[in-house]
Amino acid sequence: METIAQHRHARSSAQKVRLVADLIRGKKVSQALEVLTYTNKKAAGLVKKVLESAIANAEHNDGADIDDLKVAKIFVDAGPSMKRIMPRAKGRADRILKRTSHITVVVSDR
C-alpha cells in the first residue's frame, strides 16, 4: 500500500532540498526520521514534516503499521519562482529569483 504526502511551494530551492531527499530514499521511516533530525539543513525540517505527514496518512487512511513502512519514493520538483528587485548602484536593478519547490514523499509497506 503506497501513501503520498506533498508540500507544494516550499520556500527552498529544489537543488537544496534534493541534497536532503537523497539521504533518506529507500530507508525505513524510523531511520529516515532519525537522519533528518540530525541533519543540519533548513531543507531537512521541510522534508521531515512531509515524511511525518505521509506516515500519519498511512496510519490513519490506510491502517498501515508504522514499523513496516519505508520511503518508497521521494522526489523534489521545482515550483514557481517569485521575482524580486534588488537595487544596485547608479540607478540600476537586478532581478532576484526566490525559488520554491514541490516535495513529494511516498511511503510503502512493501
UniProtKB/Swiss-Prot annotation:
Keywords: Ribonucleoprotein, Ribosomal protein, RNA-binding, rRNA-binding. One of its GO terms (biological process) is translation. CDD domains: Ribosomal_L22. It comes from the Bacteria. GO terms for cellular component: cytosolic large ribosomal subunit. The keyword rRNA-binding applies. It holds the Pfam family Ribosomal_L22. One of its GO terms (molecular function) is rRNA binding. NCBIfam families: rplV_bact. Belongs to the universal ribosomal protein uL22 family. Part of the 50S ribosomal subunit. This protein binds specifically to 23S rRNA; its binding is stimulated by other ribosomal proteins, e.g. L4, L17, and L20. It is important during the early stages of 50S assembly. It makes multiple contacts with different domains of the 23S rRNA in the assembled 50S subunit and ribosome. The globular domain of the protein is located near the polypeptide exit tunnel on the outside of the subunit, while an extended beta-hairpin is found that lines the wall of the exit tunnel in the center of the 70S ribosome. This is Large ribosomal subunit protein uL22. It comes from Sodalis glossinidius (strain morsitans). The lineage of its organism: Bacteria, Pseudomonadati, Pseudomonadota, Gammaproteobacteria, Enterobacterales.
